[in-house]
Amino acid sequence: VKLSKELSLEKELIFLKNIDSDLKVALIANANLFLMPSRIEKKSVEGFGISFVEAASYGIASIGGKDGGASDAIINNKTGLICDGKDLNSIYDSVIDFFQNDNFINYGKYAKKFSENFHWDLIIKNYLKLIN
């Protein structure tokens, strides 16, 4: 919120919290981009990028930070982009690249296909193979 004020973007951005799942799905499904530039903050970081997989399941490609689980859920330059979440120029450049030449359309198609690797039935099947 503080950064949005510093950049005079308060009218361009909406910050939501505690939203229900129907609204979350509607917002994701109508997006062109899922952006979460994760970064390590006081040794705390997202372990796996389930949010990226969720967006991908709707055909929405992502830009994620190089720290944390984004690299497990995003194939750089195929299902989205990985950037330096601590560097505003890196984030900016990634957003510009994302929309250049309609890259986001192709990224979204690949992201949707890639998200199928994370369906629970497939994960359970693979775990059963490991223990048998």
Regions inferred by a protein language model and the residue ranges of each:
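C-terminal alpha-helical cap of glycosyltransferases
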Residues: 1, 120-132
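Acidic donor-binding loop of glycosyltransferase active sites
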Residues: 29-44, 60
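Short hydrophobic beta-strand element within catalytic cores of glycosyltransferases
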Residues: 52, 57, 61-64, 74
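Nucleotide-activated donor-binding/catalytic signature segment of Leloir-type glycosyltransferases, i.e.
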Residues: 1-23
